[in-house]
């Protein structure tokens, strides 16, 4: 059997309605996951989830749209759809998203964290951050799952993440 066949067979035995843990799509995704787990310290490592990856991708699309966000249209509608059914996912803010007020009631989404090749360095930079309530969420032992999306914005590579306490139930 090939390595992929062994993985497929082992995942097939997982059963239940929950989605199987995702494998990092790129080496950069793997580095971000490693950095987040370094930031968490002694807490159990986060598991990458493909459904939450979709939610993180939708958050990145909001940043990439580069449009002012007002109260009229829910820019986060697709991200909200992607987290439906995840345990308490709606209670957590996307990590790596900065909302800057451009005028009263109007905001512009911007990326917050640069993706780097060194996971240890990224983890140390996260530990040095202060005043980011979204990042502080990772200190909760209740948070178990994460979705990550790495993207290009301007001349740099950034990442965003979405977390939940548990997977979708059947």
Name what the model sees in each region.
Residues 19-26, 41-49, 65-67, 99, ...:
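Second-shell loop/turn segments in exported
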Residues 1-6:
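Sec-dependent N-terminal signal peptides
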Residues 10-13:
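C-terminal motif of bacterial Sec signal peptides marking the signal peptidase cleavage site
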Residues 77-169:
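A well-ordered secondary-structure block
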Residues 23-91:
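Short, well-ordered surface patches within globular domains
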Residues 15-17:
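Bacterial signal peptide processing site
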